[in-house]
Amino acid sequence: MDLKEISTALDQLDLSKYELIKKEEIADIHSAGLLLKHKKSGARVVVLSNDDENKVFSIGFKTPPFNDTGLQHIMEHSTLCGSRKYPVKDPFVELCKGSLNTFLNAMTYPDKTVYPVASCNLADFKNITDVYMDAVFYPNIYQREQIFKQEGWHYELDSIDSPLKYNGVVFNEMKGVYSSPDDVLSRDTFVSLFPDTAYRFESGGEPSHIPELSYEDFLAYHKKWYHPANSYIYLYGDFDVQERLDYLDNEYLKNFDANDVQIDADIAMQRPFDILKEETHYYAVTEDEPLENNTYLSYNKVVGTALDKKLYLAMQILDYVLVMAPGAKLKQALIDKGIGTDIYSSLESSVLQPVYSIVAKNAEESQKKAFVDTIEEVLRDIAKNGIDKRMALAGMNYYEFKFREADYGAYPKGLMYYLTMMDSWLYDENEPFIHVQALDTFAQLRKELDEGLFEELIQKYLLDNSHGSLIALVPKRGLEEEKAAEEAKRLETYKNSLSKEELEAIVADTAALKAYQDEPSPQEELERIPMLKLSDIEREPAKLYIDKKSIADVDVIHHNLFTNQIAYLMLAFDCKKVPDELLPYVGLLSSVLGLMDTHKHTYPELTNEININSGGISTDAAIYTDSKDFSKYTVMYEVKGKVLYEKLPFVLEMMHEIIYETKFEDEKRLREIIARIKSRMESNMTGSGHTVAMLSAMAQFSPSSYYSDILRGYQYYEFIEKADRDFDSMKEMLAENLKRTAALIFTKENLTVSFTAEDDGLELLQKPMTEFVAKLARLQEKDAVRTFRPVKEKTAYTSSSQVQYVARCGNYRKAGYEYTGALKVLKIIFSYDYLWLNVRVKGGAYGCMSGFYRNGDTYMVSYR
């Protein structure tokens, strides 16, 4: 529908229950926007009306923390554990079982808590909206203290003679969070920069402080802060706007009065410092982890406010030029001086005063001065002599392309617009739209690039700005044991202070909580959860557009879809000629291609050209199981690009250059890449250990999982760790094997193409693809023989984490079962009945999941 028509329709609304603050046509996201305030309750409401069938609702609250107990986080969990209309213990889980939602979750931020849902099905959208609205305003936390104990924390004592323990979902979740040095560093950074504001507190909760939260304070917080007068309600998509606004008023908002509460939710501005603050903190490592070259150094600056529309985007582009882009000047200067092996940055813009951080990982504490001196030396040079304008243009195009494309993977774009809007709306209730009206800002930034804008920003916010900190996060052996001992001693001291009667009361409370958790919700409560009828569901499945074509004797799978003149191209090369011993190099290629010099461009130049002229080129390895014979699988190497139709010749030219002309013999660059891969994999394993455990377990019996493990799992990490450790003795072999692997992969015989665009896009692909194929190598080489040998080993990997990640895997086909649609149902039963009840609810772990693949592989996983 035309935007004018959508906007005109909004003019016909009866808004008698609401005050219209503003109405805007937001062409950048093809939406007509309304900013409203509910007259009686004071609720703030934004409507983005458009033709997107993936409808989004969210209600959020401004929830700045005032201590480290994690009250806000525990409240987020607890509100979804039953309510007035839906008293079932876990309405969230029941919705997961029977909803067609495209998103269903809740999130706690440093200063807000949001409850977003999304669905393409209108009946489903209305159902889940109502469950969430009832949950936040009428939760069962007042009637069931067990909810607070289960989701937050409780004392656990099975008998008088047993050791006293803490347990609770949030308590265990945050132990997992604080096992990651990256998360510890982020926390230390905020404490250092905001000593006088709410941001010095951990809204998620620090494990040592979570048990300080009382049930009474918990209830008082909800009564005051979870009121419509403190709420931010969002409606997005294609629906009857009048019906939704009337629903909000009639079912909920009219029952509240803004005058009933006095909420001072304003977040204070931190007074700037006179000088840069320096602090040293510690993180835990195991006895066999090194102390040398294992320190994090973080240079942090507070940059303006989130309400500065131009600065909001300009800092993203400046970050791209300084650190994010391959070969970025500041990053390269630190690496060249040996200050860390992995340089990364973060821009936290979802707070009132955004924070920009530059981090050197795998550094030494003694390098603090050199770290700061190098950063400021590079910044002064850029401020004086000018920014790399071509790299800045590449950064602008990169972010503008992402904004226009609005492809956020598993996250609906309407959800991402809401989170972006909250970056301004939370701090100025009259300005929700400024950050989703971005195209004029991009145009302004392009204009001001030649006028010294970015040089001025560097001078003002990074060089002349003393509101900053330098954090050294230093490894410490035995720290985890110290924390565990402190917790055990605290519990033992408390236990020894109790009388026999008090101990018996805790034992009884423990048993009562477990009994509550064991008891299923009554059938009459379960039946109150709104479920879709068959009549609510489209009988016809979504159409798959798959049309097999041929260009220059190469198979092309065409997906004829509307893409707004953007072509999505994937070159998929079969790796059947790559022997087992070279398969780790297939994984390594995905981190090397496009990030090393070619015979035509340096790698920074290459990245600039790609990002200025396209939406990016990426490469990766993948494994596909045969859809008819599940014992067969194929290792593929995929080269992907997205461009406007007229740029198809360019993207194919760049792909050819990357796969054939990369200079693998550049030892210095190869060493940098391998060190960075090792660093990133170690960080990912700390935070996502369940994926490592799952793949390692399935690799014991599943050929496809075994080879996936070689390409991206723990076996790949072992390969990378050895390459990093023994680089000097392996460097020639590494370069030679990369060349050999690329030669075995990138041939015409191995190529299949996937192309997503309309027919006119396919027509424009014909000529450049024919030319590309003509330049492909031919290779007469026998197919490699795969030598998978199943083993049955129970494996454990140790780390300094306070929590465990556990996976149990098997293959149901080997047990005599076939794949049917019933396994989709069984997955829901396993995940949301058996595992949820036993692992999360009763065990206190943060997460659990299960799955069944068509080839028979199955898994059950718990984490944190």
What positions do the PLM features span?
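Active-site His/Glu-centered metal-binding helix of metallohydrolases
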Residues: 71, 75-79, 589
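Non-catalytic terminal extensions that flank enzyme cores
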Residues: 2-56
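Extended, regular secondary-structure scaffolds
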Residues: 220-222, 226, 232, 241-262, ...
